[in-house]
Amino acid sequence: MAEGFFFLPKTAQYQSGAATHTVAAMLVPLNSVNAITFFGSQVVQAICGFGHFADFVAITAQRIVMHPAKSFRWRLLAPQLFAVGVLSIPVVAITGAFIGMILALEGFNQFAALGQEDRLGGIINMSVVKQIGPVLAAVMVAGRVGCALAAELGTMRVTEQLDAMRAMAADPMQQLVVPRVLACTIMTPILTMYSNMLGSLGAWMVTVKVFGVSGPDYWYWTAQFVSWREPFGGLFKSVFFGAAIGLVSCYKGFNCRPGAAGVGQAATASFVASFMAIVILNLVLAQFLNTLIRWMYPILPSVLG
Protein backbone atom coordinates (compact mmCIF):
# COMPACT_ATOMS: atom_id res chain seq x y z
CA MET A 1 0.00 0.00 0.00
CA ALA A 2 1.46 3.34 -1.05
CA GLU A 3 1.88 5.85 1.72
CA GLY A 4 0.71 9.46 1.51
CA PHE A 5 0.64 12.21 4.08
CA PHE A 6 -2.09 13.82 6.13
CA PHE A 7 -2.22 17.01 8.15
CA LEU A 8 -1.86 16.79 11.93
CA PRO A 9 -3.16 20.06 13.42
CA LYS A 10 -1.97 19.45 16.99
CA THR A 11 1.64 20.17 16.02
CA ALA A 12 0.61 23.74 15.25
CA GLN A 13 0.69 24.35 19.01
CA TYR A 14 4.49 24.19 19.08
CA GLN A 15 6.10 27.59 18.67
CA SER A 16 9.79 26.65 19.00
CA GLY A 17 12.05 25.72 16.13
CA ALA A 18 12.27 26.93 12.57
CA ALA A 19 9.21 27.13 10.40
CA THR A 20 10.50 24.43 8.06
CA HIS A 21 10.86 22.03 10.98
CA THR A 22 7.35 22.82 12.13
CA VAL A 23 5.91 22.14 8.67
CA ALA A 24 7.82 18.87 8.47
CA ALA A 25 6.46 17.84 11.84
CA MET A 26 2.92 18.47 10.62
CA LEU A 27 3.24 15.89 7.83
CA VAL A 28 2.72 12.40 9.19
CA PRO A 29 2.89 9.20 7.10
CA LEU A 30 -0.63 8.13 6.15
CA ASN A 31 -1.48 4.50 6.70
CA SER A 32 -4.36 2.66 8.26
CA VAL A 33 -2.88 2.60 11.77
CA ASN A 34 -1.98 6.30 11.82
CA ALA A 35 -5.33 7.30 10.34
CA ILE A 36 -7.28 5.28 12.90
CA THR A 37 -5.11 6.64 15.71
CA PHE A 38 -5.55 10.23 14.54
CA PHE A 39 -9.32 10.11 14.09
CA GLY A 40 -9.74 8.09 17.27
CA SER A 41 -7.83 10.70 19.23
CA GLN A 42 -10.02 13.44 17.75
CA VAL A 43 -13.16 11.58 18.84
CA VAL A 44 -11.78 11.07 22.35
CA GLN A 45 -10.83 14.74 22.60
CA ALA A 46 -14.29 15.80 21.43
CA ILE A 47 -15.98 13.57 24.02
CA CYS A 48 -13.68 14.80 26.78
CA GLY A 49 -14.27 18.40 25.73
CA PHE A 50 -18.03 17.90 25.84
CA GLY A 51 -17.69 16.38 29.30
CA HIS A 52 -15.66 19.35 30.54
CA PHE A 53 -18.23 21.74 29.06
CA ALA A 54 -21.10 19.84 30.70
CA ASP A 55 -19.28 20.11 34.03
CA PHE A 56 -18.82 23.85 33.43
CA VAL A 57 -22.55 24.23 32.71
CA ALA A 58 -23.47 22.25 35.83
CA ILE A 59 -21.23 24.40 38.04
CA THR A 60 -22.69 27.59 36.57
CA ALA A 61 -26.26 26.36 37.10
CA GLN A 62 -25.40 25.33 40.66
CA ARG A 63 -24.05 28.81 41.41
CA ILE A 64 -27.21 30.46 40.06
CA VAL A 65 -29.66 28.14 41.85
CA MET A 66 -27.84 27.87 45.18
CA HIS A 67 -26.79 31.53 45.43
CA PRO A 68 -29.50 33.65 43.76
CA ALA A 69 -28.68 36.75 45.82
CA LYS A 70 -25.07 36.68 44.68
CA SER A 71 -26.02 35.77 41.11
CA PHE A 72 -28.38 38.73 40.66
CA ARG A 73 -26.17 41.26 42.40
CA TRP A 74 -26.92 44.48 40.53
CA ARG A 75 -23.39 45.83 40.84
CA LEU A 76 -22.05 42.93 38.77
CA LEU A 77 -25.07 42.29 36.54
CA ALA A 78 -25.88 45.84 35.39
CA PRO A 79 -22.63 46.46 33.45
CA GLN A 80 -23.06 43.15 31.64
CA LEU A 81 -26.69 43.91 30.77
CA PHE A 82 -25.57 47.22 29.29
CA ALA A 83 -22.68 45.66 27.34
CA VAL A 84 -24.73 42.74 26.01
CA GLY A 85 -28.04 44.49 25.42
CA VAL A 86 -27.83 48.24 24.96
CA LEU A 87 -24.63 48.24 22.93
CA SER A 88 -26.00 45.49 20.65
CA ILE A 89 -29.22 47.31 19.73
CA PRO A 90 -27.84 49.20 16.69
CA VAL A 91 -26.34 46.19 14.92
CA VAL A 92 -29.36 43.98 15.67
CA ALA A 93 -31.82 46.67 14.54
CA ILE A 94 -29.97 47.44 11.31
CA THR A 95 -29.52 43.81 10.30
CA GLY A 96 -33.14 43.00 11.18
CA ALA A 97 -34.45 45.86 9.04
CA PHE A 98 -32.36 44.90 6.04
CA ILE A 99 -33.32 41.23 6.33
CA GLY A 100 -36.98 42.24 6.19
CA MET A 101 -36.32 44.42 3.14
CA ILE A 102 -34.46 41.64 1.35
CA LEU A 103 -37.20 39.09 2.02
CA ALA A 104 -39.83 41.47 0.63
CA LEU A 105 -37.69 42.33 -2.37
CA GLU A 106 -37.03 38.70 -3.27
CA GLY A 107 -40.49 37.36 -2.50
CA PHE A 108 -42.70 39.95 -4.17
CA ASN A 109 -42.33 38.70 -7.76
CA GLN A 110 -43.13 35.12 -6.78
CA PHE A 111 -46.24 36.15 -4.86
CA ALA A 112 -47.31 38.59 -7.59
CA ALA A 113 -47.11 35.79 -10.18
CA LEU A 114 -49.69 33.90 -8.10
CA GLY A 115 -51.80 36.98 -7.49
CA GLN A 116 -51.14 36.76 -3.75
CA GLU A 117 -48.89 39.77 -3.22
CA ASP A 118 -51.22 41.13 -0.54
CA ARG A 119 -50.36 38.11 1.63
CA LEU A 120 -46.61 38.62 1.36
CA GLY A 121 -46.47 40.58 4.61
CA GLY A 122 -48.06 37.76 6.55
CA ILE A 123 -45.58 35.18 5.28
CA ILE A 124 -42.57 37.42 5.91
CA ASN A 125 -43.61 38.47 9.40
CA MET A 126 -44.42 34.91 10.41
CA SER A 127 -40.98 33.80 9.22
CA VAL A 128 -39.27 36.71 10.95
CA VAL A 129 -40.84 36.32 14.39
CA LYS A 130 -40.70 32.52 14.35
CA GLN A 131 -37.26 31.77 12.89
CA ILE A 132 -35.25 34.56 11.32
CA GLY A 133 -35.52 37.16 14.09
CA PRO A 134 -34.39 34.93 16.98
CA VAL A 135 -31.57 33.32 15.00
CA LEU A 136 -30.37 36.62 13.57
CA ALA A 137 -30.34 38.35 16.97
CA ALA A 138 -28.51 35.40 18.53
CA VAL A 139 -25.88 35.34 15.79
CA MET A 140 -25.28 39.07 16.22
CA VAL A 141 -24.90 38.60 19.98
CA ALA A 142 -22.51 35.70 19.41
CA GLY A 143 -20.39 37.77 17.06
CA ARG A 144 -20.39 41.05 18.96
CA VAL A 145 -20.59 39.86 22.57
CA GLY A 146 -19.49 36.23 22.58
CA CYS A 147 -16.09 36.91 21.05
CA ALA A 148 -15.53 39.81 23.45
CA LEU A 149 -16.41 37.65 26.46
CA ALA A 150 -14.07 34.88 25.38
CA ALA A 151 -11.23 37.34 24.71
CA GLU A 152 -11.76 39.15 28.02
CA LEU A 153 -11.82 36.01 30.15
CA GLY A 154 -9.03 34.46 28.09
CA THR A 155 -6.82 37.47 28.75
CA MET A 156 -7.58 37.17 32.47
CA ARG A 157 -6.55 33.53 32.34
CA VAL A 158 -3.35 34.21 30.42
CA THR A 159 -2.35 37.03 32.79
CA GLU A 160 -3.17 34.78 35.79
CA GLN A 161 -5.89 37.06 37.11
CA LEU A 162 -8.17 34.06 37.59
CA ASP A 163 -5.52 32.37 39.74
CA ALA A 164 -5.16 35.59 41.74
CA MET A 165 -8.90 35.65 42.41
CA ARG A 166 -8.80 32.07 43.66
CA ALA A 167 -5.81 32.91 45.87
CA MET A 168 -7.87 35.70 47.46
CA ALA A 169 -10.74 33.24 48.13
CA ALA A 170 -12.90 34.79 45.40
CA ASP A 171 -14.93 32.54 43.12
CA PRO A 172 -14.31 33.36 39.42
CA MET A 173 -17.38 31.36 38.40
CA GLN A 174 -19.64 33.41 40.66
CA GLN A 175 -17.99 36.75 40.02
CA LEU A 176 -17.27 36.49 36.28
CA VAL A 177 -19.23 33.71 34.59
CA VAL A 178 -22.65 33.93 36.24
CA PRO A 179 -23.28 37.67 35.51
CA ARG A 180 -22.25 37.24 31.88
CA VAL A 181 -24.39 34.16 31.33
CA LEU A 182 -27.40 35.80 32.96
CA ALA A 183 -26.91 38.96 30.90
CA CYS A 184 -26.85 36.99 27.65
CA THR A 185 -29.89 34.97 28.72
CA ILE A 186 -31.91 38.05 29.70
CA MET A 187 -30.96 40.41 26.88
CA THR A 188 -31.12 38.06 23.87
CA PRO A 189 -34.96 37.83 23.97
CA ILE A 190 -35.16 41.63 24.23
CA LEU A 191 -32.84 42.02 21.25
CA THR A 192 -34.98 39.46 19.42
CA MET A 193 -38.00 41.73 19.85
CA TYR A 194 -36.03 44.60 18.33
CA SER A 195 -35.02 42.37 15.42
CA ASN A 196 -38.63 41.26 14.87
CA MET A 197 -39.97 44.80 14.97
CA LEU A 198 -37.38 46.25 12.59
CA GLY A 199 -37.69 43.26 10.25
CA SER A 200 -41.44 43.77 10.02
CA LEU A 201 -41.04 47.50 9.40
CA GLY A 202 -38.38 46.87 6.75
CA ALA A 203 -40.64 44.44 4.93
CA TRP A 204 -43.54 46.92 5.18
CA MET A 205 -41.42 49.70 3.71
CA VAL A 206 -40.52 47.67 0.61
CA THR A 207 -43.88 45.95 0.18
CA VAL A 208 -46.10 49.00 0.68
CA LYS A 209 -43.94 51.99 -0.22
CA VAL A 210 -41.97 50.46 -3.10
CA PHE A 211 -44.28 47.84 -4.65
CA GLY A 212 -47.55 49.59 -3.83
CA VAL A 213 -49.29 46.84 -1.88
CA SER A 214 -52.14 48.12 0.26
CA GLY A 215 -51.01 48.96 3.79
CA PRO A 216 -54.20 47.70 5.46
CA ASP A 217 -53.89 44.43 3.51
CA TYR A 218 -50.28 44.06 4.67
CA TRP A 219 -51.23 44.32 8.34
CA TYR A 220 -54.47 42.35 7.92
CA TRP A 221 -52.66 39.30 6.56
CA THR A 222 -49.93 39.75 9.14
CA ALA A 223 -52.59 39.46 11.84
CA GLN A 224 -54.03 36.39 10.09
CA PHE A 225 -50.71 34.58 9.82
CA VAL A 226 -49.06 35.64 13.09
CA SER A 227 -50.83 34.49 16.24
CA TRP A 228 -49.44 34.46 19.77
CA ARG A 229 -47.74 31.13 19.06
CA GLU A 230 -45.11 32.48 16.66
CA PRO A 231 -43.72 35.32 18.83
CA PHE A 232 -43.87 33.11 21.91
CA GLY A 233 -41.93 30.35 20.16
CA GLY A 234 -39.29 32.77 18.92
CA LEU A 235 -38.77 34.34 22.34
CA PHE A 236 -38.74 30.92 24.00
CA LYS A 237 -35.93 29.80 21.71
CA SER A 238 -33.99 33.03 22.17
CA VAL A 239 -33.69 32.36 25.90
CA PHE A 240 -31.82 29.14 25.16
CA PHE A 241 -29.77 30.84 22.45
CA GLY A 242 -28.61 33.51 24.88
CA ALA A 243 -27.74 30.99 27.58
CA ALA A 244 -25.78 28.91 25.08
CA ILE A 245 -23.84 31.95 23.86
CA GLY A 246 -22.90 32.99 27.39
CA LEU A 247 -21.89 29.50 28.49
CA VAL A 248 -19.87 28.69 25.37
CA SER A 249 -18.07 32.04 25.34
CA CYS A 250 -17.17 31.90 29.03
CA TYR A 251 -16.05 28.28 28.71
CA LYS A 252 -13.77 29.08 25.78
CA GLY A 253 -12.30 32.04 27.67
CA PHE A 254 -11.69 30.03 30.83
CA ASN A 255 -9.93 27.28 28.86
CA CYS A 256 -7.92 29.26 26.31
CA ARG A 257 -4.30 28.38 25.60
CA PRO A 258 -1.44 30.57 26.82
CA GLY A 259 -0.27 33.53 24.76
CA ALA A 260 -1.87 36.10 22.51
CA ALA A 261 -2.56 33.46 19.87
CA GLY A 262 -4.51 31.44 22.42
CA VAL A 263 -6.77 34.39 23.20
CA GLY A 264 -7.48 34.94 19.51
CA GLN A 265 -8.21 31.26 18.99
CA ALA A 266 -10.58 31.27 21.97
CA ALA A 267 -12.51 34.23 20.54
CA THR A 268 -12.81 32.57 17.14
CA ALA A 269 -13.74 29.20 18.62
CA SER A 270 -16.40 30.83 20.80
CA PHE A 271 -18.23 32.27 17.79
CA VAL A 272 -18.02 29.05 15.77
CA ALA A 273 -19.22 26.92 18.69
CA SER A 274 -21.96 29.43 19.56
CA PHE A 275 -23.23 29.48 15.98
CA MET A 276 -23.32 25.68 15.86
CA ALA A 277 -25.15 25.61 19.19
CA ILE A 278 -27.69 28.14 17.88
CA VAL A 279 -28.58 26.18 14.74
CA ILE A 280 -28.72 22.85 16.59
CA LEU A 281 -30.88 24.29 19.36
CA ASN A 282 -33.09 25.95 16.75
CA LEU A 283 -33.79 22.60 15.10
CA VAL A 284 -34.44 20.78 18.38
CA LEU A 285 -36.60 23.52 19.89
CA ALA A 286 -38.54 24.07 16.66
CA GLN A 287 -39.48 20.39 16.58
CA PHE A 288 -40.37 20.48 20.27
CA LEU A 289 -42.59 23.53 19.86
CA ASN A 290 -44.28 22.14 16.74
CA THR A 291 -45.04 18.90 18.58
CA LEU A 292 -46.34 20.82 21.58
CA ILE A 293 -48.59 23.03 19.44
CA ARG A 294 -50.00 20.03 17.56
CA TRP A 295 -50.75 18.36 20.88
CA MET A 296 -52.43 21.46 22.31
CA TYR A 297 -54.29 22.36 19.10
CA PRO A 298 -55.02 19.20 17.05
CA ILE A 299 -56.86 21.20 14.37
CA LEU A 300 -55.28 24.52 13.44
CA PRO A 301 -57.10 26.97 11.14
CA SER A 302 -55.54 27.62 7.73
CA VAL A 303 -55.19 31.06 6.15
CA LEU A 304 -53.75 29.82 2.86
CA GLY A 305 -57.05 28.96 1.26
Stretch-by-stretch model annotation:
Residues 28-77, 252-257:
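Short, membrane-interfacial amphipathic segments enriched in basic
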Residues 71, 80-136:
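Active-site cofactor/substrate anionic-group-binding motifs, chiefly glycine-
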Residues 80, 160, 171-192, 266, ...:
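Start (N-cap) of specific transmembrane helices in multi-pass transporter permeases
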Residues 95-98, 138, 142, 178-207, ...:
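Hydrophobic alpha-helical transmembrane segments that constitute the membrane-spanning cores
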Residues 106-129, 197-239, 248-269, 289-305:
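Membrane-interfacial helix-loop-helix connectors in multipass membrane proteins
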Residues 120-163, 191, 248:
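Hydrophobic alpha-helical transmembrane segments of multi-pass membrane transport proteins
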Residues 153-178, 259-263:
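Short cytoplasmic-facing helical segments at TM-TM junctions of multi-pass membrane proteins
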Residues 189-193, 197, 227-243, 271-284:
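Hydrophobic transmembrane alpha-helical segments of multi-pass transport and channel proteins
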